[in-house]
Amino acid sequence: MSATAETLAISTETREFLSRTHKLFINGQWVDATSGETLGIIDPATEAQISEIQLASTDDVDKAVIAAQAAFKGEWSKINSHQRTKLMLKLADLIDENIQTLAELEVLDNGLPMMLAEYTISGYASDFIRYYAGWCTKIHGDTIPVSPAGVANGESLTYTRREPVGVVGAIIPWNAPIAMLALKLAPALATGCTMVIKPAEITPLTALKVMELVKEAGIPDGVVNLVPGYGEVAGAAISSHPDIKKVSFTGSTAVGQKIVEAALGNLKKVSLELGGKSPVVVFPDADIEAVTMGAIRAAFFLQGQNCMAGTRLFVHQDIFDQVIQNVAGVASQMKIGPGLDPSSQLGPLISADQRSRVMSYVQAGKDEGAELICGGNQLDRKGFFMEPTLFTHAHQDVKIAREEIFGPVLFAQPFGDSDLETIAAEANKSIYGLSGSVWTKDIAVGLKMASLIDSGQVSVNCHAAVDPAIPFGGNKMSGWGREFGQEGLEPYLKTKATTVLFSQPPF
């Protein structure tokens, strides 16, 4: 741990956790990686190394899968649904009890403001686990009446069982580490699956801490295994492993496509939550103050490093200038700083490479003739900081309007008195279809426009309304399947139909 990390205003427990060289968590034990490789973990707000992890090899992934298989066929299979509920509720309680350390680790690892870290833990991660704990006892099959012409001729019983698919591989992104971990861990445990989890190698700290809590909660050894490592090594091994029956991935569309190719070997189930370029459509009767703050949150939440980000702002021409002036005014006054500073509203980007990538889009916007309204600069100080940025242009023919930037860059465009279908066609002019929002006081217009936007999730007078019970996922190049809610259980389950013949049919 660096001298900088030692002087941070963090708890003793967090400081002690950072001081370790972190191993892999396999079969309930902390074990050394066979690769012998380590990686320093960097605080994006200071550029200082704050901790070090060991990196998993393909052999390590194999060991984790073997442990997960043994647990799936052994002790975990003997634990009933009521017991699974109790174990999950215990884990959720432990997460809440450790919120200070978890929040500090999330801030140091990822850079997000402390307020958001605390929210994603207590207001999301633990509640998400509790929500799915409630599903453990409600997963069931059906009895099915067969047709008179069926082979059993009515003198039979046919029923279905919902069974866990087996060992699940989960690949976690760096933009919301603990939230994404909970999102994949909870439905897997609820359905009775076991897991091999690969956190993003640059943000593994909260996942490592949660493994301690998994052990403390009494979840049997081998049910949850953690293999931090590079995507091209550990992630690729998970995606192609013949004994992993399902992969859940959140990340870029390009990597998602590679995972699909790797999964072909054993035709494993794949669920993907990928990129986005979500539209925010504002009609002239909308509450401008609400729109202003809604657009700010939609575009700049997590420094714009989130797949749901509302990065394409469509505003009716009658209020366009006012909305742009308001958004620029708020964005320009946002406090940019380290997440541990309680006054910070916008933290750093995750890395120097990510900031360079985002800044290249800013330059592309300028080069292609978009008008820079505010921001557009990186900060000349330690940390990977940049200003929230707003561009406008009359058309979506510029790169910043088409491609996912994954940074605090908002593109705004006016529209006129067109019919809703024409406006929706502009909003849908994207390869992505993850989220979106409509802002209006006319509920009929709001509902109609929401129905026309081709996204897996659309909100009216808010953006990215998420809740454990609301299904979430993308259309088009934004992914496959749904997470959250009852639908989030489906990828972890398979259906078995059984028919019992009572008497031979007369022929």
Stretches with model-predicted labels:
Residues 140-290:
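Rossmann-like NAD(P) dinucleotide-binding subdomain of oxidoreductase/dehydrogenase enzymes
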Residues 1-53, 86, 90, 138-171, ...:
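Terminal low-complexity tails and localization/encapsulation signals of metabolic enzymes
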Residues 50-140:
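Glycine-rich loop-to-alpha-helix module at the N-terminal edge of alpha/beta enzyme cores
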Residues 49-56, 73-77, 169-170, 280-283, ...:
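Short, well-ordered beta-strand elements within core beta-sheets of diverse protein domains
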Residues 47, 84, 106, 192, ...:
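Residue-level signal for inorganic ion chemistry
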Residues 48-51, 244, 281, 335, ...:
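Conserved C-terminal structural/oligomerization subdomain of aldehyde/semialdehyde dehydrogenase
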